[in-house]
């Protein structure tokens, strides 16, 4: 699987995230000859246990994240952050969980945007919105380098692309920037060769960071 970075929009102090940022970002991709390939969607759910007996609470993870990825439509990924565990399951697991009612989705976030091809790169740019809401909570951008699946070998190329991207975006004088978070995948038992589990971990930690950043800016 190609190496992928998941960037998130970090607003400047005192500014907010809006659909206008997404519009500017997609226009910027097209201005550097990105070819639009279609829509892009993904979902993230934040689960909490439905405990009938509080005495059992120590036996269950306090919370975990479930993620569906656009490029893995038949799979569903779980991340238990406190225990540094990432699991891959069949997408039907969501229906099973609904019937069992052992965990309930407390927060659901949708990623909605567009996919582009740009040379050896595939880009996905989209807004993050809660269920049944149009309030934009964030902007996320996937950068995928198609020829390489080794994170170490792709590092330099990805950094160079990010420089070019930030230069192009800087011309638009937007109140913030896209940032990449360096992660220690070894903590989750993941190696150098990129897998969908790497992407799931990226999303889990990017979302936690993005929510904290937005709250700090508002504060």
Swiss-Prot record:
Query: One MF term from GO for this chain?
Result: transcription coregulator activity
Q: Which InterPro entries match?
A: Mediator_Med20 (IPR013921)
One cellular component term (GO) for this entry is: mediator complex
A Pfam family annotated for this UniProt entry: Med20
Does Transcription count among this protein's keywords?
yes
Keywords from UniProt, A to Z, are: Nucleus, Transcription, Transcription regulation
Q: Where in the cell is it found?
A: Nucleus
Q: Which domain of life is it from?
A: Eukaryota
- From the record, give the transmembrane residue ranges: none
An annotated GO BP: miRNA processing
The record's similarity note reads: Belongs to the Mediator complex subunit 20 family.
| Role summary | Component of the Mediator complex, a coactivator involved in the regulated transcription of nearly all RNA polymerase II-dependent genes. Mediator functions as a bridge to convey information from gene-specific regulatory proteins to the basal RNA polymerase II transcription machinery. The Mediator complex, having a compact conformation in its free form, is recruited to promoters by direct interactions with regulatory proteins and serves for the assembly of a functional preinitiation complex with RNA polymerase II and the general transcription factors.
Name of the protein in its database record = Mediator of RNA polymerase II transcription subunit 20a
The root-end lineage is: Eukaryota, Viridiplantae, Streptophyta, Embryophyta, Tracheophyta
């Amino acid at each position: 699987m190609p190496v992928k970075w998941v960037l998130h929009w970090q607003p400047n102090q005192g500014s907010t995230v809006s659909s206008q940022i997404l519009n500017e970002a997609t226009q910027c991709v097209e201005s550097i000859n990105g070819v639009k390939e279609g829509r892009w969607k993904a979902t993230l759910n934040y689960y909490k246990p439905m405990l009938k007996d509080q005495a059992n609470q120590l036996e269950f993870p306090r919370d975990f994240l479930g993620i569906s990825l656009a490029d893995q439509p038949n799979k569903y990924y779980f991340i238990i952050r406190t225990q540094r565990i990432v699991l891959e399951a069949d997408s039907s697991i969501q229906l099973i969980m609904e019937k069992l009612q052992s965990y309930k989705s407390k927060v659901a976030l949708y990623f909605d945007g567009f996919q582009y091809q740009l040379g050896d790169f595939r880009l996905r740019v989209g807004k993050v919105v809660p269920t049944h809401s149009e309030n934009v909570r964030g902007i996320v951008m996937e950068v995928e380098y198609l020829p390489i699946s080794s994170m170490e070998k792709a590092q330099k190329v990805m950094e160079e692309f990010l420089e070019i991207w930030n230069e192009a975006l800087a011309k638009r004088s937007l109140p913030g920037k896209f940032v990449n978070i360096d992660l220690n995948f070894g903590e989750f038992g993941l190696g150098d060769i990129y897998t969908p589990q790497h992407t799931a971990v990226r999303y889990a930690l990017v979302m936690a960071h993005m929510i904290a950043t937005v709250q700090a800016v508002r504060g």
